[in-house]
Amino acid sequence: MYFANANIHPQNEYEHRLETIQALASERAYPLIEGSYDTDAWEETAGRIGQELEELREGAGIANEVVDSPNPYPLPPKEDKGPHVAAAREKAAQLRRARCRACYRLRFEETAHYAAEHGFDAVGTTLSVSPFQYTDIIEEELLRACKKAGVNCAFTDYRPYFEDNERISKEMGIYRQNFCGCHFSDEEAQLERTIRKAARKAKKAALKAAKKEAAEKELLGSINENL
């Protein structure tokens, strides 16, 4: 196993995740290699695109919106704010994908290069287990990195096993993070949770109001019948 995660922020989060995989590797007698934790290289590539995205969102007044979330569970529809904002949303979606692509590329190239240098014939990734990732981009970038390094690409879409993965990790007491890794994804995950929580609260309030209205109508109808 090769741990290439220069995207993870802050450093104590990186260390927590590394210690988790080290414990599992030790328990299963799997060899584990820690890659480079070069956060400067990450910021110069994926981070630069992420900053451009944040500036666009601020300028377009959509900083409180979730942009192009790969989450399979739909969010509440966005308010129509006209063609200018619609164009900004489209550009923001492109930038978010580009940011994640740059992140995948940096880490896969590092991994594939190590594999080629140390006699491994193929590289795969566990990123594809998450339905909250851009699986299509992961496959494209893994294939690209492997071709560049001269090793085989062993991509597998593990999303069908996501629920099993969650269940087993919980049974084993393995730490599970609630965001991908970078500081942008941390903020996006928090925003998405806030929006979903507000939507659930609004739905619950609407159902309660509807039940109350129905009960009042039923009571009024009963009173009218007795007059």
Q: PLM ranges: what are they?
A:
Residues 1-227:
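Nucleotide-activated chemistry modules centered on ATP-dependent adenylation/adenylyltransferase
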